[in-house]
Amino acid sequence: MFEYAERLARWADALRSDTEWTSELESSFDAIGFDESYLSTLKEARRKYNRIKAIKDHIWGMIEIEPSDAWLLDSPLFQRMRHIRQTGLTYLTYPNAHHTRFEHSLGVYFVVKRLLATFRRTKEAFNIAAQHRTYLDIRFTPVAYERHSRQERLLLHAALLHDIGHAVFSHVSERLFAANSDRLRIGKKSIQQFRRSFQEKYDLVDSDIQTGRGKPLAELLTVGIITSSRFARFYRLLPGQPDTDPLPDLCDISTLVLGDRIEPNDFALPELLSGPVDADKIDYMIRDAHKPEHVN
């Protein structure tokens, strides 16, 4: 693992040792159907994930979902986002603004796939070395879905999972949490302490928080979910996933969600998901503006 993922692994270990966090998280998993009973059905269910699915999106048209990605999409964790509105409480004023994190995450996945396909077609241009350092060091592979490189596969999974830590009213909830960060608790810790524990393990300093390098709470919760023991057991059953400890992959996915590199020279890869002009922004700007009553 590269340095960012190693730092996340330290934080994940600390979270797993917090019995209250683990208990509350697993209770939340149980409440949405991501429980032991669901996990017990997955070995048999894997046989169904042997071909591409297609979902029609009103923004991007037909989105093809590859088997291992459909496995994530069909999980109760991802399906929960059908009930989380993208724009919080805006729909109360603009009735057409009722789109959800579910369709947004699908859109981000689609845009990332398009960007990767473009990179693949123009790989020679993007692999030109500048000052003896390769700008984009992605091991490109044929277009066939089963041959995606590890980096591409993890980026696509990060695209699907990047918003699973959002609370019920999206960013509105975050403002509520921020205003009560010393009183509301996550496991044994207040939200303030939870953020501080990440800051310490991820080697951020106070100035990082003040200058905006501090990670949003929704992203920290996403990382906590992805690196949890139960999610690791679920991910280990992923079609095509080797039967080994998935924590290195999950830490790399989490690193991409946070906008950091998973390889020393992968400067461009994380920016496809979290950069000045990234797949996340491309989708939500188009999707939010598409609703005629929700135009600023």
Language model segments and positions:
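Sequence-structural signature of the catalytic-core scaffold of metal-dependent phosphohydrolases
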Residues: 2-85, 89-157, 165-296
